Curated annotation (Swiss-Prot):
The keyword Hydrolase applies. SUPFAM superfamilies: dUTPase-like. It comes from Photorhabdus laumondii subsp. laumondii (strain DSM 15139 / CIP 105565 / TT01). Substrate binds at R71, S72, G73, N84, L88, I89, D90, M98. It catalyses: dUTP + H2O = dUMP + diphosphate + H(+). The gene is dut. It is an enzyme of class 3 (hydrolase). This is Deoxyuridine 5'-triphosphate nucleotidohydrolase. Belongs to the dUTPase family. This enzyme is involved in nucleotide metabolism: it produces dUMP, the immediate precursor of thymidine nucleotides and it decreases the intracellular concentration of dUTP so that uracil cannot be incorporated into DNA.
Length: 152
């Protein structure tokens, strides 16, 4: 299923120096977001920084949202993950996409202008309506959690 999402280019380098986000393969779920920087940013161990992507989006469909997720290689190889772990973009948001990066590693890491720093994935939304009850219908699991089902 393909859905059109309104994207506004805020930084004129996008489409010129930095490519527009595209799906890498037909099976890709995420589009890479790039750091729209004038100069490289060095992240010291433990440091967080809010980086612009140069893109604004308006999803405009209440049945969709977007999540900003880390790129696996940055986290696994360099210890750089999202500062808020996951970013949620609501359908009515119309501002610039910003990415909070956090260096949880023990070495400084430099982010270059145009470097891919995160990915955005569009997801369906179900808005819940709470139904107040006194008790739940009994299930096999019950209230067991946090390892209740074992390790193997």
């Amino acid at each position: 299923m393909m859905k059109k999402i309104d994207v506004k280019i805020l930084d004129p380098r996008i489409g010129e120096e930095f490519p527009l986000p595209t799906y890498a393969t037909p099976g890709s779920a995420g589009l890479d977001l790039r750091a729209c920087l004038d100069n490289a940013v060095e992240l010291a161990p433990g440091q967080t920084e809010l980086l612009p992507t140069g893109l604004a989006i308006h999803i405009g469909d209440e049945q969709l949202a977007a999540v900003i997720l880390p790129r696996s290689g940055l986290g696994h190889k360099h210890g750089v993950v999202l500062g808020n772990l996951v970013g949620l973009i609501d359908s009515d948001y119309q501002g610039q996409l910003m990415v909070s990066v956090w260096n949880r590693g023990d070495k400084a890491f430099t982010i270059q202008p145009g470097e891919r720093i995160a990915q955005i994935v569009f997801v369906p939304v179900v808005q819940a309506e709470f139904n107040l009850v006194e008790d739940f219908e009994t299930s096999e699991r019950g209230s067991g959690g946090f390892g209740h089902s074992g390790r193997q």
